[in-house]
Amino acid sequence: MIYLDSSVALAHLLAEDRFPPEDLWQQQLVSSRLLEYEVWNRIHARRLDRSHGDAVRALISRVALLELATPVLARALDPFPTAVRTLDALHLSSIVFLRLRQQQVRLASYDERLIAGVRALHIPLYGPAVCCKPDVSDGGIGLAHLYPARE
């Protein structure tokens, strides 16, 4: 099972000349309900809902969305081994919640801080770990140089 982070979902939706690995989309995907809000927020901010709305709905329909249940929220209040942002704490808590229920979850992300948090918790990553520095050529989402260019 692959925990899909919004950085990968947005790269798939927005980065036309770059792309996440194709085999990712053949895996069982799960994420926090936050994924839906993060993706739509970015799509609306760029005024792409008309051009990308169907693709967003199709992508989100492929992902099992985990609600922000009390145990997830409670874990997010506890400290993490690395400094994390609020949404990252909720994503990490969701992954921990699944793993405590014997789910073999790996993270697919291009978010450097989220990857650091997962590594500190000894949770495996999907595929090669890819971190990045912000890149303004893709509108500031920091994804343009993460994927191999399409040939």
Language model features: what each stretch is:
Residues M1, S31-S32, E36, R99-E151:
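Acidic, PIN/NYN-like endoribonuclease modules and their adjacent C-terminal/linker elements
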Residues M1-L35, R42-A55, I123, A129-C131, ...:
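Short, well-structured N-terminal submotif of metal-dependent ribonuclease cores
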Residues L4, S31, E67, T86-A89, ...:
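Short beta-strand scaffold positions
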Residues A9, L35, V72, H91, ...:
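Alpha-helix capping/helix-boundary segments
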Residues S61-S94:
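Acidic catalytic patch
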